[in-house]
UniProtKB/Swiss-Prot annotation:
Single Gene Ontology BP annotation: tRNA wobble position uridine thiolation
Localisation: Cytoplasm
Keywords: Cytoplasm, tRNA processing
Designated name of the protein: Cytoplasmic tRNA 2-thiolation protein 2
Pathway(s) where this gene product acts: tRNA modification; 5-methoxycarbonylmethyl-2-thiouridine-tRNA biosynthesis
PANTHER family reported in the protein's UniProt record: CYTOPLASMIC TRNA 2-THIOLATION PROTEIN 2
Cellular component terms (Gene Ontology): cytosol
Length: 464
C-alpha cells in the first residue's frame, strides 16, 4: 500500500526534520504518478499538516498533504459523518451498496476498518456490554441491459466478489442480485418485464432515472429480506453536486433537500451517506495511493440531462475543485425534511451525552414532510402535487388515475409513456413492491366510495 509507505516519513506524527530521504523519494514518485493518472497534477514539496518532506498531493482548498495525512483526512471525514449523525448503532446491521467504483470501494474499506476497530475495543472491554455492528455488501447486477459479452460481464462480477472477499473479516454476507429480480413473479421471469418497461420510456433521462429508482428498490428488497437496519451509499460530494443541478433542471427543487442530507429515513430501510463531504477525485486518488482495486467495467454510459450536467460539473472542477463543495453546501442550506434525521424514541441512548442534544425530535409544527411520496422515485409531494392528488381521489374512476396521481411531476413527464392505454400497460409491468401499495390505496378508496353510495339518496327517492 503506497500510503502505508508514507508512514516512514512520519505521517501525522512526523516533524519537519524527517531523514528518510529514500522513502520520501519513493513516496514522491508514487504520489506524482497517482496524481497524473487521476488528473491531479498540482503537487507541493511538503505536507501542509505534518510538515514531512514527502511530496504532497493537493486537495480541495489548496492544502498539500502527504499520503498518510491525505488518507487520515478522508477517513476522519467518514468517521465524523458516521458518528456525529448517528448513522450506525452498535446493534445495527448495515448493508453497503457496492458498485465497484472508487467511492463505494473507499466506503467499503473505511466501514471495514471501523468495524475491525470496534471489534478490538470490544475484545479488550471488561464489560463487553455493547455489541459490534455488522456489515453486508450488495451489488445490483444491471448487465441485462448491457451490450457487453457475457464472459466479460461474468469476469467483472467475479472481480467484485474478489474485492469483497479480500477483506479478512467484518463482512456479514455478499449479495449479488439481478436488477430484473424485482420484476419477477411466481409465474414469470422479470427480464422480459424489465426490458419492456424500459423500452416504453422514450426519454433518455427518464430511462436513467427509472433505473436509479429500480436500483434503490433492489437495495431495499435485499435489506428487508436479510434483516439489515441501514443502507449505506457511496454517494460523494461530486455525485451530489451533479444531482443538485440535474434535479433543479428537472423541476425537482421542492424535494431536493431530501436528497442531500446525511440521513434519509423516508424509506422502509433508512439510507445514509457517509461520503457526502468527500470529492470523487480525492476518493479516486486514495484508491490509487492505497492500491484499492476497483471494477467499473459494468458502468453504463450516461445520456440526457444527467450527462450534460456531469460534463458541466467537470468543467467547473477544472477551473476550481472546490466548486463541487460550494454547490453541495448551497443545497444544504435548504430546509431539510423531518425524515432527514433519526428520531425514534431511545435511538440515541448509546450516544455520548454531548451529542444527544443535536438529535432532539423535530417539532411537528416545523416538519415539512408531506407524508406523501412519489410511487417510483420517493420524492415528497409539493403543495400543487398534493392538491392534484386530492382532486384525483375524488373524481377517479379507474385505478390508473390513482397510479398516475401518485407520481411526481418529474416522473410523470419523463418516465410515464404518453396515453392512458400505454400507462395502464406500463404500470402492469412495474414491480409489485410499487404497485401493491397503490392497489391497497385503490381498494380502500373503492370501499369508501361504495359505503358512501349506500347512504346517498337516489334522485327519485322521496325520502320515505
Amino acid at each position: 500500500m503506497a500510503a502505508a509507505a508514507a508512514s516512514s516519513c512520519g505521517g501525522a506524527g512526523c516533524g519537519p526534520h524527517c531523514s528518510s530521504s529514500a522513502s520520501a523519494a519513493a513516496v514522491e514518485d508514487a504520489a506524482a504518478a497517482a496524481a497524473e493518472k487521476v488528473g491531479r497534477l498540482s503537487l507541493s514539496r511538503e505536507c501542509g499538516k505534518c510538515g514531512g518532506g514527502a511530496a504532497a498531493v493537493a486537495v480541495a482548498g489548496g492544502l498539500g498533504l502527504c499520503g498518510e495525512c491525505f488518507r487520515a483526512n478522508l477517513l476522519g471525514k467518514f468517521k465524523l459523518a458516521v458518528t456525529s449523525n448517528a448513522m450506525v448503532r452498535p446493534t445495527d446491521s448495515v448493508l453497503l451498496a457496492f458498485s465497484g467504483g472508487p467511492a463505494s470501494r473507499v466506503a467499503l474499506q473505511f466501514i471495514h476498518e471501523m468495524r475491525c476497530k470496534a471489534i478490538e475495543s470490544w475484545d479488550v472491554s471488561n464489560s463487553q456490554a455493547l455489541p459490534v455492528f455488522g456489515v453486508g455488501v450488495a451489488f445490483v447486477d444491471e448487465s441485462v441491459l448491457c451490450s457487453k459479452p457475457r464472459d466479460e460481464i461474468e469476469m467483472a462480477i467475479e472481480d467484485i466478489r474478489s474485492i469483497v472477499s479480500s477483506l479478512s473479516t467484518g463482512v456479514k454476507a455478499m449479495h449479488i442480485v439481478r436488477l430484473e429480480d424485482v420484476f419477477s413473479t411466481e409465474s414469470e421471469d422479470g427480464e422480459r418485464r424489465l426490458r419492456e418497461a424500459v423500452d416504453m420510456i422514450g426519454d433518455d433521462t427518464g430511462r436513467e432515472d427509472f433505473l436509479r429508482c429500480l436500483r434503490m428498490l433492489s437495495l431495499q428488497k435485499i435489506a428487508m429480506e436479510n434483516g439489515y437496519a441501514k443502507i449505506m451509499l457511496g454517494s460523494c460530494a461530486s455525485a451530489i453536486a451533479c444531482h443538485v443541478l440535474s434535479a433543479t433542471v428537472k423541476g425537482q427543487g421542492y424535494s431536493l433537500p431530501a436528497d442531500v442530507q446525511y440521513v434519509d429515513t423516508r424509506w422502509e430501510i433508512p439510507v445514509v451517506l457517509p461520503l457526502r463531504d468527500c470529492l470523487a477525485q480525492e476518493l479516486t486518488l486514495l484508491c490509487e495511493l492505497d492500491s484499492l482495486k476497483t471494477q467499473q467495467h459494468l458502468d453504463r454510459p450516461s445520456n440526457g440531462i444527467n450527462s450534460l450536467v456531469a460534463s458541466f460539473i467537470k468543467r467547473l472542477r477544472e477551473e476550481n475543485p472546490s466548486r463541487e463543495h460550494t454547490i453541495v453546501r448551497t443545497a444544504q442550506k435548504l430546509k431539510p425534511f423531518s425524515f432527514n434525521k433519526f428520531s425514534a424514541d431511545g435511538y440515541h441512548d448509546f450516544l455520548p451525552s454531548r451529542l444527544r442534544p443535536k438529535f432532539q425530535k423535530v417539532d411537528s409544527d416545523e416538519s415539512t414532510f408531506s407524508e406523501i411520496l412519489c410511487l417510483m422515485c420517493g420524492s415528497p409531494f409539493s403543495e400543487s402535487e398534493l392538491q392534484n392528488l386530492e382532486s384525483t381521489k375524488h373524481k377517479a374512476q379507474k385505478k390508473i388515475d390513482l397510479y398516475t396521481a401518485h407520481c411526481c411531476q418529474s416522473c410523470y413527464f419523463q418516465i410515464l409513456p404518453a396515453g392512458e392505454n400505454l400507462n395502464e400497460h406500463f404500470f402492469s409491468l412495474l414491480p409489485k413492491l410499487w404497485t401493491g401499495k397503490m392497489d391497497t390505496i385503490s381498494d380502500s378508496h373503492s370501499l369508501l366510495r361504495d359505503q358512501i353510495e349506500e347512504y346517498l339518496l337516489e334522485e327519485n327517492d322521496d325520502g320515505n
